[in-house]
């Protein structure tokens, strides 16, 4: 989980803009209820470990915004105010197979601080926030990467195009021109992320109206766009493969700057498919929560006023409580509302990447109410836990493989066609269970095999020393039915059939 440290002075300055007095003791005592863990607090600041699902808490500005609502009952709207801008960015159609999702925004008149120390601290905080988003939402820049630029150094409109690896420009922290290939071979960021462009003859660059490269996503910015102590107007670009991750990343950077007084302006993007997009979209997302689901999970009826107050603490809004007029006559799923059933219409911020399902709204309401306030009733029926029939076999398999020096891992059951079949050069031998409305391109199906997940893990760690030996015993879904499978994979310099046979024989002997 990402760990961040925020200075007391930074938090105090941000809260004072809204007439709130900062209380470090209150933060240390209650902030953990919101979705993070206070690791340490000293005279200089507070160190916080943020849960993986709360990517909206990774900057001091967004954390202060969340704390305003949660700790101080200061209502924060679930929308981000975005004014209509005039700057455009044209995206070449060739980017569809290189890096198809391209978004941008302008933020002007940001208050970066009153002293050089405050402005330097702001720049460092902005860069840290950017890298934390790369790590979490961006999956190490694979799904989304962010570029932040000094707008005063740019000449709009902008163009995104594909260039060959001989194309030259001066990258960040360098004083001379380098070719794309030289950057990938020798620049620190180039060598770290070159694998994201592996096998591509052409790579993406963003240029301004006079042909200067301001960004080479997902690797490095141009040197002339560097953010300095004098920068108050910003241009943000976000590129990647996952539209939802890119949108959330863009909104969170804009939100951080808006919390410092910045005015967010939209950009007109002529996308890879020829459609015109106006981004960012600061409007809240609307969700439907069946009252039946809320009552069943929380154990009783929750009044609308309590729901409204709880959602406001979490940065959301209860729009209305009404009777459902459409949907199935009778629903077999808790999350679906039937005709005639009472539902709650809820707005949550579009940058809340973790709100995927109505059950997430139940969690938001429970957190806003406070788990200590939900009651302490116990079940009148006492039951004893009994191991499942397969539990002993699974334990023996894991123990056998672990005793052979193979590390046990646990990967996600959700996967996609590329990992499960295309990269493995396999064809599906069973019916594939697909997600009806996938939130991300990474998770579109339920896995049929475990081995592709292990291969993906080894591929991600190919830069680390060998040997690497991993195994997993877990569930797969074939022909829409769950089943248990075991797989192991070893990356070794001298690996061969004899080693694989030895592992199989040892496992058979132990069973």
Per-range role (PLM):
Residues 47-49:
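Function-determining surface determinants
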């Amino acid at each position: 989980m990402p760990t961040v440290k925020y200075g007391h002075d930074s938090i105090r300055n941000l809260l004072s803009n809204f007439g709130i007095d900062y209380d470090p003791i209150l933060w240390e005592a209650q902030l953990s209820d919101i979705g993070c863990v206070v690791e340490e607090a000293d005279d200089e600041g507070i160190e916080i470990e943020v849960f993986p699902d709360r990517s909206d808490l990774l900057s001091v500005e967004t954390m202060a915004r969340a704390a305003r609502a949660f700790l101080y009952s200061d209502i924060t709207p679930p929308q981000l105010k975005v004014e209509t801008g005039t700057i455009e960015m044209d995206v070449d159609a060739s980017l569809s197979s290189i890096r198809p999702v391209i978004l941008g925004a302008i933020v002007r008149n940001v208050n970066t601080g009153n002293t050089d120390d405050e402005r330097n601290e702001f720049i460092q905080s902005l860069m840290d926030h950017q890298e934390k988003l790369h790590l979490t939402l961006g999956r190490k820049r694979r799904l989304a990467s962010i570029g932040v630029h000094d707008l005063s150094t740019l000449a709009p409109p902008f163009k995104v195009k594909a260039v060959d690896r001989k194309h030259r420009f001066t990258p960040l922290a360098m004083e001379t021109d380098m070719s794309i290939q030289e950057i990938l071979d020798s620049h620190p960021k180039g060598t770290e992320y070159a694998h994201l462009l592996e096998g591509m003859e052409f790579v993406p660059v963003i240029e301004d109206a006079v042909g200067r490269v301001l960004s080479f996503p997902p690797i490095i910015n141009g040197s002339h766009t560097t953010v300095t102590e004098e920068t108050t107007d910003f241009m943000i670009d976000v590129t990647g493969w996952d539209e939802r991750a890119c949108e959330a990343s863009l909104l969170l950077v804009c939100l951080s700057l808006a919390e410092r007084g910045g005015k967010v302006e939209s950009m007109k993007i002529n996308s890879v498919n020829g459609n015109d997009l106006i981004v960012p979209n600061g409007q809240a997302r609307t969700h439907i929560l069946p009252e039946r689901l809320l009552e069943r999970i929380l154990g009783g009826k929750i009044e609308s006023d309590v729901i409204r107050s709880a959602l406001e603490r979490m940065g959301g809004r209860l729009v209305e409580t009404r009777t459902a007029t459409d949907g199935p006559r009778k629903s077999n799923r808790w999350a679906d509302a039937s005709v005639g059933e009472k539902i709650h219409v809820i707005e949550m911020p579009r940058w809340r990447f973790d709100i995927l399902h109505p059950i997430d709204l139940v969690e938001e309401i429970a957190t806003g109410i406070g788990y200590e306030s939900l009651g302490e009733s116990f079940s009148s029926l006492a039951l004893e836990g009994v191991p499942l029939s397969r539990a002993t076999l699974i334990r023996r398999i894991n123990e056998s493989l672990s005793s052979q020096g193979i590390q046990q891992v646990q990967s996600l059951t959700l996967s996609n066609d590329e990992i499960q079949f295309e990269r493995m050069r396999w064809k599906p031998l069973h019916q594939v269970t697909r997600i009806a409305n996938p939130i991300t391109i990474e998770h579109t199906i339920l896995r049929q095999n475990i081995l592709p997940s292990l291969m993906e893990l080894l591929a991600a760690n190919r830069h680390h020393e060998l040997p690497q030996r991993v195994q997993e015993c877990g569930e797969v879904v074939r022909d829409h039915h769950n089943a248990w499978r075991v797989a192991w994979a070893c990356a070794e310099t001298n690996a061969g059939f004899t080693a694989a046979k030895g592992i199989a024989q040892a496992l058979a002997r132990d069973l």
